[in-house]
Amino acid sequence: MLLTQFAGRDRKGKAVIKLIVFDKDGVILDLSATWLPVVRAVADYTISRLPPETAGRLGAADLLASIGVDAASGWIDPAGIFAKDSFAVIQSVWQRQLPAGAIELRSDAQYQQKVNALVLQLARGKSHPKGDIKTPLGDLYAAGLRLALLTNDNEASAQQNLSDLGVAQLFSPVVGADSGHGAKPDPHGLLFCCAANGVDVSETIMVGDTMADYMAAKAANVADFICIAEDAAHRPNPAIKPENVIPSLELLPELLRGRGDTILQANAS
C-alpha cells in the first residue's frame, strides 16, 4: 500500500505518521569519528593565530573544553556546544576565551578560509555512519515514509555528508542552520520540513539526540520525539519517554511498527 493510498487518520481517528525528520550528527553520522579530527585541527589552528606574547595562557585543550570536548580522552558532552551547534556558534564561544585584541574569528577572512580548507581536507569523503543507516533509512523510504533532515550544521556540509554516505536521495528537504529558518531549538526549520512535504505537525516525528532537537520538536508540537542514546538514562530530558530511546537507527523501523500509527504498521497488517 502506497502512502498516497493510506488514509490521513487510522481507524481510531489518530493522525498517521507520514514524515520523519532527522538530526544529523550523532543520529545519522558518528559525531566523534567524523568531526572530532576536524574540531581538534581547527582548535590548534586558532591557537596558532594568537599573538606570541600570549603563548601559554590558552591552549587548544582549553578551547575544546569550552565546547564540551575532553582533549585527552576525546569524550564529547552530548549537551555541549560541539554536540549540538554549528562552527559559527563554536567560534563565538571561542572568541570569548581569546585575549583582548586577538584575532576576530568570525570576520578574519584568512582564518575563515583556513577553517573551510581544514573541513574540506579532513571531513569531505570521510563521513562515518552511526552504525548501519542505509538499511533502516532505505526501508522507511521504500515503505512510503517521507524523510527530511534538520541540522545545526550548514546545509552544504549536510548535503555532502549524506552524499558521502550514499543516502542523499532519501531526504527532502535538507535544512541547515544557514538555510534561512533559524537553528534548533528554534522550531521554524522543523515547521519548514513539514510544510515542504505537505504534512501537518501531527503527522510528523522528530528523531534526534540533543536537548536542542527535543526542544525544537516540542516547540513545533510534532507528534513525538525519538531519542538516539546508548541508554535511556542518557536521554537529554527526563520528559522523553524511555520507550522512545534507541541506541541507533537500526532499531527505528521496529519502534515505528510498534506504534501502530505509521505506514509501516499498515503494511504489516
Q: Where are the regions that the model predicts?
A:
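Conserved phosphate-coupling serine/threonine residues in phosphotransfer and NTP-handling enzymes
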Residues: 27, 151-153
